[in-house]
Amino acid sequence: MDIFNYSRRETSEVNIGATPMGGSNPIRIQSMTNTSTQDTDACVAQAKRIVDAGGEYVRLTTQGVKEAENLMSINAALRQDGYMVPLVADVHFNPKVADVAAQYAEKVRINPGNYVDAARTFKHLEYTDEEYAQEVRKIRDRFIPFLNICKANHTAIRIGVNHGSLSDRIMSRYGDTPEGMVESCMEFLRICVAEKFMDVVISIKASNTVIMVKTVRLLAHIMEKEGMHFPLHLGVTEAGDGEDGRIKSALGIGALLADGLGDTVRVSLSEAPEAEIPVARKLVDYMTQRRNHPYIPGAVAPEFHYLSPERRTTTAVHNIGGENLPVVIAVRLDGNMDFNPQFTPDYVYAGRQLPEHPIKGMQYIIDADLWNGQPDTWPAFKSEQLPFVSGFNASLKFLFISYMGLDDEAIACLKYHPEIVLVAQSIHPNRLGEYRALAHQLMNEGLKNPLVFFQHYAEDEVENLQIKSAADMGALIIDGFCDGILLFNQSKQKGGKKISDKVTDATAFGILQAGRVRTSKTEYISCPGCGRTLYDLESTIARIKQATSHLKGLKIGIMGCIVNGPGEMADADYGYVGAGRGKISLYKKKECIEKNIPEEEAVEKLIELIKKNGDYTER
C-alpha cells in the first residue's frame, strides 16, 4: 500500500442482485430501514425514499422468521413498482432466521458475535486449546448449511463484526482488541474459502473511530497475507445525528477511503434513513475525486507503524506538541473577534493586523514582517522568510510550509530553531498524501517541531465543510501526526451563504473530539435505529441533548435495542437502551441500574441518575 498516493484496493467482485460490488465497480451507497419488517407498506415506502435519494442497497432488520418471510412480499412490491434495489436481511442471534432470509433477500448479514456463540455477557471464559477449537468447529457445522442455502439461491452474505457485540469467547481470548475483532471475522472467512463460497462482503464497525480504523486496516492486512480479496463495507456505528454524526462518520470512513479501502459505505445517522444517502455520496465523491493525482514522492519513516500508529514525538513549544492536547487555531482576517465560549480557539491567526481591541489572554499570530513583540502575539513566517527567523526574539514562532518547501534550507533552520511550530499547507489534489509525506519527512530528518495542519475550503454549506474537513483530518489524527488544526473557510462566490467563523471553530473542535484526541463537549453514542427500535429515537435524542449538552466530557449512549447497546456503550458513562415496546433500561457504565422504565419517564430518570452520581451541573 502507498499511503501517499491514492488508489483503490483491488477486490473481488461480489454479485448482489443486479448491483455487483467490488472489483471495478464504483463504491456503493446504502442505508437501512427503521420500520417494522412485518409492515410491508412502511418498509416499501421507506425503501423507495432511500433509493430515490441515491441508495443502492436497502437493509432491513430481520429478527425472526416472520420478518424473514415477509422479505418476499417487500421485494415483490418494490419490483412491481420498478425498484430493483437489492435487499439485505440483517440477522442477529438466530441462524435459523438467516437460513430463511437467504431464500428471499439478495444478501444476508450475519454477526459472528452472536451467530452461534451466546449473546455477550461480559463474563471471562476459560478454554483449553482443544475446547476453543471445538467451539470453532461448532461454527463450521452450523455455518456450512447456511452457505449451501446461499449457493442454491445465489444469495451473497456480509460477515458483519461489531465492536459492541463480540462474543465472550473472543473477548476472553483476545480481549477488547482489534485482533479479537479481526479473528472473529476470519473464523468465518476461512470457512467460506474452504467451501469455495466467494460472494462475501466484510464489515468491522465500532463507534470509536480509532478502533474502527485500526481494525479495518488490520483486517485488510491479514486478508492480504492469506490471499483474500473480499470487498469491504465501511461504517462508524452509533455515530449520532447532526454535526456530530457527520463529522464522526466522515473522519472514520474517510481515513479508510483515503487508503483505498472500502467498496460500500453506510453513514449511520440517528435521522431518517434517506438522510444518510447524500452524506455518504458527498463523502465518497470527495475522496475518490483524487484518483490519478500527480505523484507524491513520499518516504515512510522506519519508526512509523501503519497498523498500530503512535503519536509522533515532538518537542513542546508552549502548549503545542509534546504531551499537550492538539490546539485549534482560528482565522480572523477581518478583525471579527466573536467566539463561542464553548469553542474558544487556543490561537487566532490575524494575518496582517491585530484587532483594535485584543481580547485579554487570547494568543494572536500575525505575519512576521508586522510583528514587533506585542504581548500575547507570535510571528508567522513564510518559507521565503527563513533567512530572517533568527532575527526575531520570540519563544514561539510559526512557519507556513508545504511538503516541497521542506528543502535543505528549511531542514537546517528547523534543526536550529526548535521553537518553530510548522503549519502544513498544500494545494495538491491529494492534500492528505502531501501532509503525510511532510510528517514522514520530518521523522526521517529527526525533526521534532510540532505540526499543525492548515485545512482550507470554499464551502457555502456547513455539511460540506464538516464532511470534507473531517475526512481530510481523519488519517492524520489516527496516524499520530496532529498537534493542531487551523481550519479556514471562504464562501465560493460573493453573496454566497457565509458559514460563520464560530461554526468553523466548532467544526475544528468537533473533528478533534471525533478523533478522540481532545474533548470539548458532551459525547453521544447513538444508533440510527432499525426495526428493533420500539421507541421514538430521534425525539428522545433531542430531549437528552437539550438536558445534557452542557456536561463537557460526559459520554451518554442512546441505543435502540440490546444488539450492540451494552457493548458499544462500554466506555460510556451512562446508557439509555430500548428494552421492549415503549420500555427503557438505564445503565451506569456496564451495569444495568433500572429496567423496563416507561418511555415517557425515562429521560427524566436518566437525568436523576446522572445527578445522583454527582455528574450533573447546572447550566
Predicted regions and their residues:
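Beta-strand/loop-dominated core regions that host nucleotide or nucleotide-derived cofactor-binding catalytic loops
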Residues: 581-584, 592-615
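Glycine-rich phosphate-binding active-site loops on the catalytic face of alpha/beta enzymes
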Residues: 56-59, 105-121, 258-274, 480-494, ...
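A structural motif
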Residues: 52-57, 105, 197, 261-262, ...
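Active-site beta->alpha loop and helix N-cap motifs at the rims of alpha/beta catalytic domains
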Residues: 2, 55-187, 318, 327-433
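Short, acidic/polar
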Residues: 38-49, 93-98, 249-253, 335-341, ...
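N-terminal amphipathic alpha-helix/helix-capping segment at the start of soluble metabolic enzymes
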Residues: 1-31, 147-153, 289-336, 546
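Conserved, mostly hydrophobic/aromatic
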Residues: 29, 90, 159, 202, ...
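Catalytic alpha/beta core domains of metabolic enzymes, predominantly
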Residues: 126-143, 148, 170-320, 393-398, ...
